[in-house]
Regions:
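Beta-alpha-beta core module
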Residues: 69, 76-82, 87, 149-197
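Flexible hinge/capping segments at coil-to-helix
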Residues: 73-89, 93-115
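A late-sequence structural motif
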Residues: 29, 177-220
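Hydrophobic hinge/microswitch elements
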Residues: 42, 51-56, 61, 120-177
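Secondary-structure junction motif
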Residues: 18-23, 65-67, 107-135, 200
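Short helix-loop hinge/linker segments at domain boundaries
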Residues: 1-11, 26-29, 70, 74-81, ...
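N-terminal winged-helix
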Residues: 2-49, 198-201
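N-terminal segment of the mature folded domain
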Residues: 46, 51-73, 84
Length: 220
């Protein structure tokens, strides 16, 4: 078996818009042969991949409450965050959920329902969570490492998660809806790169496409 060197790679948190942007980029580039990589990672995994050069850039978000801590970690790793858009957090829940038709929700309204979230590395701070307001205590919570599993469990258990307002592909085929979350916290979505390094042509194309997707589907 011949190992082909990867010529372009992106690491990111578990957002489906990463996948769709990557697909759009590959299709636009075309070509008879290529070796690319798209890596779903924990927040620390995204930082490590970009800092080591394994990926050219990493897609992640920070909130108005976690930005200082996340940016400090990025700075220590020799990285910088480039914001593309701000968005409002939303509660993602199944179409059959009793709260699905609410005009807006608070986390108090969701206390009786299972909370699904993406598991982070054991020693990662709460600020590295992929969900806004992750530090709020929940009586029922389930950690997942896979996007499809999280979506399916939300439906099967009548649970919920807190996601971005970027609705493109949010259901992942699982039939999820989103409702605005009543909070002052804002999401800052963007990408991380190594300090002082410019993106290559493919990386810039990815970022340009990502920005268009985010602007098109963001909810405020």
């Amino acid at each position: 078996m011949t190992t082909t060197e990867t010529t372009f790679a992106v690491s990111g948190q578990h957002y489906l818009f990463n996948v769709q942007t990557f697909a759009h980029t590959v299709l636009a580039l075309g070509g008879d042969a290529y070796a690319y990589a798209l890596r779903d990672r924990t927040t620390q995994g995204v930082i490590d991949d970009v800092a080591s050069g394994k990926s050219e850039l990493g897609v992640l978000f920070q909130t108005s409450a976690t930005a200082d801590e996340v940016n400090a970690a990025l700075d220590a790793a020799g990285l910088e965050f480039v914001e593309l858009i701000q968005s409002a957090p939303r509660v993602a829940l199944p179409a059959s959920h009793p709260m699905v038709n609410a005009a807006s929700l608070t986390l108090e309204y969701m206390e009786d329902y299972p909370y699904l979230y993406f598991e982070q590395d054991e020693d990662s701070p709460v600020a590295f969570a992929e969900e806004a307001l992750a530090g709020v205590p929940r009586a029922k919570s389930i950690a997942c490492t896979d996007r499809a599993s999280l979506s399916e469990l939300i439906v099967a258990l009548n649970g919920y998660t807190v996601t971005s307002g970027i609705l493109v592909g949010i259901s992942d085929g699982a039939g999820l809806n989103t409702v605005p979350l009543n909070t002052d916290v804002q999401l800052h979505l963007g990408y991380v790169v190594r300090k002082g390094e410019q993106l290559g042509e493919t990386g810039q194309r990815f970022v340009d496409t990502l920005k268009k997707n985010l602007e098109r589907y963001a909810r405020f």
